[in-house]
Amino acid sequence: MNEKEKDMDKKMNSEAQLTTFEAISMIVGNSIGTGIIAVPYLAVRNSMWDVVWMVAFAYIVNVILHLIIAELSYNNGGVQLVKSFEGELFHGKMKKIFSWIMFIVYGLAIMVGVSGNINGGAQIFVNWFGLPLWAAQLIYYLIAGSVVFMGMKAGGIAQKYSVALLLVIVAVMTAGTFLHPRNTLYTAPFHINNLLALYSMVVFATSANQAVIQVVKGLNGDSKRIRKTIFTGFGLSSLFVLVVPL
């Protein structure tokens, strides 16, 4: 680590410290969302081999993009993405204007993603308990919003146990799929539009921009552990995405 990295480590502002597994779990927990539900719909419109290499390609792209995000946050003391852009990309008289434009665009993107999660989660309550959709959305929002008050460390611990349980469930489901297969591996004619749609959904389903920034802070700017977390976390997320279509 050079002198600049050491200096940035000292300035890292974090409310809690994470273990490597907690950091990996935050990546996995934040990346696996409602988008994974749409993957099988798009996967069956491609051959299984196309799905495999597309998930692998999406993994490489995701790792590169999130390493860039991690470096931006790291170089600016663990700040959020928009603030990193302000420090690294925007200069001169238009700096504030570009920063606000980025804030609005990024904020809208997050709102769309969160809205999808709320609607998807609320639909489960509707199916289970027969609640009106608005009531289910409100309940899910309150439950999801309570995570903010738990703090980053408690969130990391919760994610650790959730991901461990998810690994067990996926392992059992995968074993059952191969031991008692109901269908052969599906094939479909190649079509570029179907492949691009699958790629877009896989990248969306495994994105974890905010989690990476929390990882940078939670690991106190330890570059080796940050890289290890990103490679491993997105590897597990890609594995989950690949298993679901089976």
Task: Go through each PLM region and give its residues.
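Short helix-coil transition sites and intra-membrane helix breaks within transmembrane domains
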Residues: 30-32, 73-77, 111-116, 202-206
